[in-house]
UniProtKB/Swiss-Prot annotation:
Keywords from the named record: Activator, Cytoplasm, DNA-binding, Phosphoprotein, Transcription, Transcription regulation, Two-component regulatory system
Keyword Nucleus: no
Residue ranges the UniProt entry marks as DNA-binding: 180-199
GO cellular-component term (any): cytoplasm
UniProt source species: Priestia megaterium (Bacillus megaterium)
Domain Response regulatory: residue ranges: 7-123
Record-linked InterPro entries: 2C-system_Tx_regulators, CheY-like_superfamily, DpiA-like_HTH, Sig_transdc_resp-reg_cit/mal, Sig_transdc_resp-reg_receiver, WH-like_DNA-bd_sf, WH_DNA-bd_sf
PTM (free text): Phosphorylated by DctS.
Pfam families, alphabetized: HTH_64, Response_reg
Task performed by this protein: Member of the two-component regulatory system DctS/DctR. Essential for expression of DctP.
Gene Ontology MF terms in the entry: DNA binding; DNA-binding transcription factor activity; phosphorelay response regulator activity
Protein known as: Probable C4-dicarboxylate response regulator DctR
């Protein structure tokens, strides 16, 4: 049976942001905010009380931050899915949030379209898996790659989400600035392709660019993920 409504719990300390997020969520068909908490401690209690399908958590909060809250949710065995909505963009926080099973990570500031995208992808995946007791590898691949394709609609023409994610992952593993040639070799793509993705990420303010001037030849651009 398809679930026609998903319950959502908001954990956000800023009342104005909390209200904006509530309005965003309830504009998307099939989602209802059933409760809201202003900190992680209160949020965990509300999860226990309401058992929401989806919990949307900010990372920076008083009393108990979002990452600690997410860890506690998993330690207690609560089955709510989690979307992180936060200004935190440092790689270590992103990695930990994903390791604890967040289904999406939305960076502030964001527009309604990004929240809508996250919720629609979540809804689509939940509807599809609710229709089956068992699933094949090809069916699972189709569901997961559909999410990449939907994200690709937001990218400039010629770029795709799968390659972008591979490049972001490769960059996150580096501890020093690297060139487009090194990215191309590491990811297994053409140098000109790597350069296009790196330029896009720089425009999105995700990369720090440094220029290396050698004795001969043209300067070399080197890139590193920003850690705020």
């Amino acid at each position: 049976m398809n679930k026609k409504a998903w319950t959502v719990l908001l954990i956000e300390d800023d009342p104005m942001v909390q209200e904006v997020n509530r309005q965003f969520i309830e504009q998307v068909e099939g989602f209802t905010v059933i409760a809201a908490a202003s900190n992680g401690l209160e949020g965990v209690q509300l999860i226990k009380q309401h058992q929401p399908d989806l919990t949307i958590i900010d990372m920076y909060m008083p009393s108990q931050d979002g990452l600690t809250t997410l860890q506690q949710i998993r330690a207690n065995g609560y089955k709510t899915d989690v979307i992180a909505v936060t200004a935190a963009s440092d790689i270590e926080t992103v990695r930990k949030v994903l390791q604890y099973g967040a289904v999406d990570y939305i960076m502030k500031p964001f527009k309604f379209e990004r929240m809508k995208q996250a919720l629609e992808q979540y809804r689509s995946f939940q509807v599809k898996i609710s229709q089956k007791e068992h699933i094949t590898q090809s069916e699972l691949d189709s569901m997961l790659f559909q999410q990449f394709e939907e994200k690709a609609d937001l990218l400039p023409k010629g770029l795709n989400a799968v390659t972008l994610r591979r490049i972001q992952q490769y960059l996150s593993e580096q501890n020093h600035p690297i060139s487009a040639e090194e990215v191309a070799d590491g990811v297994g793509i053409a140098r000109v392709t790597a350069r296009r993705y790196l330029e896009f990420l720089e425009q999105e303010n995700e990369l720090k660019l440094s220029v290396e001037y050698g004795r001969v030849g043209r300067p070399i651009n080197r890139y590193m993920l920003k850690i705020n």
